[in-house]
Amino acid sequence: GGMDAGQAVEVVSGAENARKGIGVALALPGTELPGLGQKVGERVIQGVRSFGMALSPRELGVGEYGGGLLEFPEDALPPGTPLAEAWPEEVVLDLEVTPNRPDALGLLGLARDLHALGYALVEPEAALKAEALPLPFSLKVEAPEGAPHFTLGYAFGLRVAPSPLWMQRALFAAGMRPINNVVDVTNYVMLERAQPMHAFDLRFIGEGILVRRARPGERLRTLDGVERTLHPEDLVIAGWRGEESIPLGLAGVMGGAES
């Protein structure tokens, strides 16, 4: 539901990403939430009356993540806007793709298949303007049979912030969790074009990127927080400095927690 313009309410949240200035989804007392199984009420938390509840994706019923608030970009919506206006119901197609059609793992590949049946196809235009500048790091590929083509780009001057609502909605619909605009755009393009992508923090790269097979017993903590023991057949993307290289991600599968 919506709130009257100018109406102020006090809500207590212990979420890890709760901070001043962010936009959140607010459920007022009496609201029934699909991911909570009960009505929201007023509660007293540490002596402060909380008039409602700021919501995580799980509580709102749009995703599995329940450890933090659903976070909107600054000025995405005027405070008090009913969420249904910005987050309409989705229709999601769940498709099983056979291994011989990796092109159909992306939206564009599916659209091309439908185009062959007579449906209209509008190819998305690439608005990116890239300059051929020297990179501040190197690239080495030790396992060309596993990565015959590896492309690196370099972006600077970025402001890390929540993604636009339309992109967050698309990622949630595809079963992914929005993180921030930098991570989300790589996942969005991956879903669109079936091309695995990852954004690396330059601080973790060192002298450059090394694509190699994992060493026996090598371990990697992935983005989902799981510590994994790697197999020598696993292809890893590592940051290297001198003779040492540390895995930053499992190629084509998942990035590392520190990457």
What are these regions (language model features)?
Residues 1-259:
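RNA/tRNA-interacting regions in translation and RNA-turnover enzymes
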